[in-house]
Each structure stands twice: as C-alpha cells, then as structure tokens.
C-alpha cells in the first residue's frame, strides 16, 4: 500500500500550497523571493503559476533587477509576465531586450506560446513597442511563420500584425488558402439523410459556410492597416 506521504504528486501539491500562502500582501522578504524563484521555471504549470502570482505580491525592489540577469528561458518568461502586470513603463525596454535575447527557434511549442504571451503583456501593460522593437520582433518571428502548428500560427500571425511585419499579409493569405476546413464532414451526409424535411436546407447552409479554420486569420488581418496591395485586398 502507498503511504500518505508517498502519494503521486504529493510533493508538488505541498510546494504549490506553500506558494499560495504568499498570495497576499505583507509577506515580502528576500527569503520568500528565493523560495519563489526556485519554482518559477518548474515543469509543473500549476506550480509556475502559483510562483508567478506569489512573486507579484513581493516588493518589486526585491526581484525586478534579478529578472534582467536571468538566463533560463522558462524562468525568465514567467518572471516577465509578473513584471508586466504592474505596468511600469520605465522597465519596458529592459524586459523586452531580455525576451528578445532568448533563442525563439530553440523553444518548445508551449514555450513559444508563453514567450508570445509575455511579450504581448509587456507591450499592452507597460508600453507599446517602438519602431525599432517592432522590427526586432518581426525579424525573429518572420522565419518561424508559418510553423504548421495551428495554435502557434494564430499567435504568430497576431504578433506579426501587431508589429507591422512587411511579410505577414502574404504569408497569412497563403496560409488561409492552404488551411483545410474543420473536420466532421464525413458524418454530415448520413445525419442529414435522416430528416427529409430539414436535411436539404441544412445541407445548403453548410455548403455555403466559410472555412472555420480560416476565420481566426481573417480576424487578425483586419487590424493590418498598412502594406496591402489591391490583389491582396481582393483575395482577402
């Protein structure tokens, strides 16, 4: 029999609960920051989340400079989210510089999504990107798009539009034309055949439906105000 202290996940739950005790004001200390920092890059997402929230309750003076010297990607990305939430514009350039030094191509798909989220939060909460920052982000992400990963491609398209990439329109339109429609078509005729009254009308409606997998890209491109050609507009 498994002892109570040996249950799977028991250690992780204990760590998470310790971190959650720091989710309130008035508990700032160097000792707490050290404990939190050890878990910001944890493999368990719930522990990373608990550590990040705990860090946000610590006095910024105890940890913000430490973020700028951090080299471990997962830890840096998580800490950057915590840093972005208060919205201190003074630190925007420093944290953007640190995020852009991470080798994006070497990250896992999940880490890339977290990186994009962190950078988005920095731009939204702290300060919008400068022209130079826009160009730097585009230079990193353009070779990565498309990635043939649906969720990642949607986020990449959104960021590239946000930074006014000169290549995102062509790449996204091409991706839209090549993206297959959502699945489920194989079962539809059989289902419609069961009802002679409504089947025909529904079949006509489905035949004229837009490609649902194209919709997120069309939605993102609506924000692209510059760089369109007449042919691109027509295709869009």
Predicted regions and their residues:
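Extracellular/periplasmic ectodomains of large secreted or surface enzymes and adhesion receptors
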Residues: 1-236
């Amino acid at each position: 029999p498994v002892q109570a202290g040996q249950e799977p996940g028991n250690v992780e739950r204990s760590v998470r609960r310790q971190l959650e005790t720091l989710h309130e004001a008035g508990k700032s200390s160097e000792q707490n920051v050290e404990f939190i920092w050890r878990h910001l890059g944890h493999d368990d997402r719930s522990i990373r989340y608990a550590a990040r929230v705990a860090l946000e309750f610590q006095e910024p003076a105890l940890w913000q400079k430490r973020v700028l010297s951090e080299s471990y990607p997962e830890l840096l990305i998580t800490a950057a989210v915590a840093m972005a939430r208060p919205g201190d514009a003074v630190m925007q350039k420093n944290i953007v510089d640190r995020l852009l030094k991470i080798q994006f191509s070497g990250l896992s798909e999940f880490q890339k999504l977290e990186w994009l989220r962190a950078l988005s939060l920095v731009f939204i909460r702290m300060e919008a990107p400068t022209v130079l920052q826009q160009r730097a982000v585009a230079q990193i992400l353009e070779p990565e798009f498309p990635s043939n990963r649906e969720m990642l491609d949607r986020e990449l398209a959104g960021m590239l539009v946000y930074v006014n990439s000169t290549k995102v329109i062509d790449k996204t339109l091409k991706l839209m034309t090549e993206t297959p429609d959502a699945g489920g078509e194989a079962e539809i005729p059989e289902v419609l055949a069961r009802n002679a009254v409504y089947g025909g009308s529904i079949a006509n409606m489905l035949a004229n439906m837009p490609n649902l997998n194209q919709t997120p890209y069309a939605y993102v491109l609506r924000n692209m105000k510059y760089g369109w050609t007449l042919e691109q507009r027509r295709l869009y």
